[in-house]
A protein has these predicted regions:
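Conserved Radical SAM active-site core
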Residues: 4, 27, 45-133
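Canonical Radical SAM [4Fe-4S] cluster-binding loop centered on the CxxxCxxC motif
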Residues: 9, 15-17, 21-59
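Conserved small/polar residues in nucleotide/adenosyl-binding loops
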Residues: 158-160
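Short, basic/glycine-rich phosphate-binding loops at helix/coil junctions
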Residues: 43-48, 77-78, 138-146
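Conserved radical SAM core fold
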Residues: 88-89, 116-119, 138-154
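Radical SAM enzyme core and accessory elements
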Residues: 1-8
Length: 160
């Protein structure tokens, strides 16, 4: 079996923020992934919805991690990296690779997700479990628990 070079895994990144203070504990480097299937009326990042756009860039884990490390001295003991979106789970392989490499450096890793791509199927759970093994905190963004209101607010069904 060939070992994966996680540093070379690529993802479509919309943008990054070097000094986030609301997406997890402490000061954080935020990676906003491109793509989301929900269309929330109150979305802060509607420019991340499209799966591809001229505003996003395909980047390697190594590239994103090197950018993040420039700001590590601001994180203190509580900060780290948060991956958000768009919807981070649409690019689960990239997020898993990024967190795997970050954990090797002792970096706290937070996943910000609405869990829309999540599926309770064995083949998905294997991939999802690999991500959870390298995730310190999940910020689960539950949009609405009433099915009718959820559709009105997000243009998508509740699926979990």
């Amino acid at each position: 079996m060939t070992e994966i070079d996680y540093k070379k895994v690529t993802g479509l990144v919309h943008s990054t923020e070097s000094f986030g203070s609301v997406d997890g504990p402490g000061i954080r480097f935020i990676v906003f992934m491109q793509g989301c299937k929900m269309r929330c009326q109150y979305c802060h990042n509607p420019d991340t919805w499209a799966m591809e756009t001229n505003n996003s860039k395909e980047r390697t884990v190594e590239d994103v991690l090197n950018e993040a490390l420039q700001y590590r001295h601001f994180w203190g003991k509580k900060g780290g990296i948060t991956v958000s979106g768009g919807e981070a789970l649409l690019q689960i392989e990239f997020v898993t690779a990024l967190f795997t490499e970050a954990k090797k450096l002792g970096i706290h890793c937070t996943l910000d997700t609405c869990a829309l791509p999540f599926r309770n199927k064995p083949e998905y759970l294997v991939v999802f479990d690999k991500l959870l093994e390298v995730t310190d905190l999940v910020l689960l963004d539950i949009k609405e628990i009433n099915e009718k209101q959820h559709i009105i607010m997000t243009l998508s069904l509740i699926h979990i």
